[in-house]
Amino acid sequence: MRGILIAIEGINGVGKSTQAMRLKKALECMDYNAVCIRFPNPDTTTGDLILQVLNKMIEMSSEQLHKLFTKHCSEFVAEIAALLKLNFIVIVDRYIWSGLAYAQADGITIETKNTFKPDYTFFLSSKKPLNEKPLTLQRLFETKEKQETIFTNFTIIMNDVPKNRLCTIPATLNKEIIHTMILTKTIKVFDNNSCLNYIKMYDDKYLNVQELNLFDFEWQKCIEDNNDKEEYDDDDFIV
């Protein structure tokens, strides 16, 4: 038995952070253990550095930036695994799908090793932000052309996500409707898949959450090849 990893994805400015925090608070009010992790995470050195680049405070090559984001995601493997072992619903406000979509917009291939495939992904679908910023306030990647390219990349990536692990929601829907859809589906996914012990890594290996030692966090010892993991077969995942 373990918790679940929920990803909320989409281009900049479509309400991901709002929905992620609302989901966390609603779950806690219903006595579920829930935590929200934002990427980039401003509370870490790596995340803060990425945000400085995005806010155009410092410069960095595109290749360095995208590789740094993937490294940043991998820094949270032990923390996410521990939370899953403790039966938390872990909500990630952006994750590896964002890393891929944004890197591909710059024609860059990134390493996805040491990252998880989310148990379930909510994709807030929109080609443009709900409220466009003035040019002077735009962060890196927030030009109209770049966001449209990133949106196209997202749609291609999401086409490869198993349909029973993905919910695409028009970002222009009423916020209350979006929240209700996300909350209802998250609870259903959690309640229907409480028997899971493994979580799939992006390289198609598996991490045995139940074998994780919370005292040493040596999660590498819990990695197994993808044989005999019938309990985690995509066709058997219940939503």
Swiss-Prot record:
It catalyses: dTMP + ATP = dTDP + ADP. The keyword tRNA processing does not apply. Gene3D superfamilies: P-loop containing nucleotide triphosphate hydrolases (3.40.50.300). Pathway: Pyrimidine metabolism; dTTP biosynthesis. ATP binds at G10, I11, N12, G13, V14, G15, K16, S17. GO terms for biological process: dTDP biosynthetic process; dTTP biosynthetic process; dUDP biosynthetic process. InterPro entries: P-loop_NTPase, Thymidylate_kin-like_dom. Pfam families: Thymidylate_kin (PF02223). One of its GO terms (molecular function) is ATP binding. Signal peptide: none annotated. Keywords: ATP-binding, Kinase, Nucleotide biosynthesis, Nucleotide-binding, Transferase. It comes from the Viruses. Its EC number is 2.7.4.9. Catalyzes the conversion of dTMP to dTDP. Belongs to the thymidylate kinase family. This is Thymidylate kinase.
